[in-house]
A protein has these predicted regions:
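Walker A/P-loop
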Residues: 15
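ATP-dependent small-molecule kinase phosphotransfer cores
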Residues: 27-86, 90-98, 134-135
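Conserved beta-strand scaffold positions in the cores of enzyme catalytic domains, especially
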Residues: 23-28, 109
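A glycine- and Lys/Arg-enriched "phosphate-lid" helix/loop adjacent to the NTP-binding pocket
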Residues: 48-53, 98-137
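ATP-binding Walker
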Residues: 12
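Short, well-ordered coil/turn elements that cap or connect secondary structure elements
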Residues: 23, 80-82, 104-105
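Extreme N-terminal starter segment of soluble prokaryotic enzymes
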Residues: 1-4
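P-loop (Walker A) phosphate-binding loop of NTP-binding proteins
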Residues: 9, 21
Length: 137
């Protein structure tokens, strides 16, 4: 089964690519969902500051590949079920290294790119809890 990892700046359009993949029957694993789950598990508000603090705190404590490592079990289950899998939101070389070690050449990486102006406009429109405001962007 095909395995694609998306990467790109916030609001570049990764979610749109993931939505199209899902409409075509692909399983989508959004790495950010793990961060949201951990934030909620700790009893923290799903707000940009707390989500960011959890994400970065775990990276500092366990290494920058921590969220990719924690994704492997879910991705493996999706693949075992026979699904093509799209990984939404891979960040940085350490996460790529985790996925390359686990999946080798079966992993295809795709960068989604949009201008800063376009990304800011999307952030202001979509109102996602982890986006923050224009000043944070």
């Amino acid at each position: 089964m095909t395995l694609i990892a998306l990467t790109g700046m916030p609001a570049a359009g990764k979610g749109e690519v993931a939505a199209v993949a899902q409409q075509r029957g692909w399983a989508v694993h959004r790495i950010g969902d793990l961060v949201w789950e951990e934030t909620e598990r700790r009893g923290l508000e799903l707000a940009p500051a707390s989500v960011g603090a959890v994400a970065n705190g775990e990276r500092e404590a366990h290494g920058y590949g921590v969220w990719a490592s924690r994704s492997l079990e879910r991705i493996d289950a999706l693949r075992a079920a026979g699904s093509h899998v799209l990984i939404d939101g891979m960040r940085g070389e350490r996460e790529l290294a985790v996925f390359r070690t686990a999946y080798g050449d079966a992993l295809v990486t795709v960068a989604v790119v949009a201008s800063a102006e376009q990304r800011l406009a999307r952030v202001q429109q979509r109102g996602r809890i982890d986006d923050g405001d224009a000043a944070a962007f």
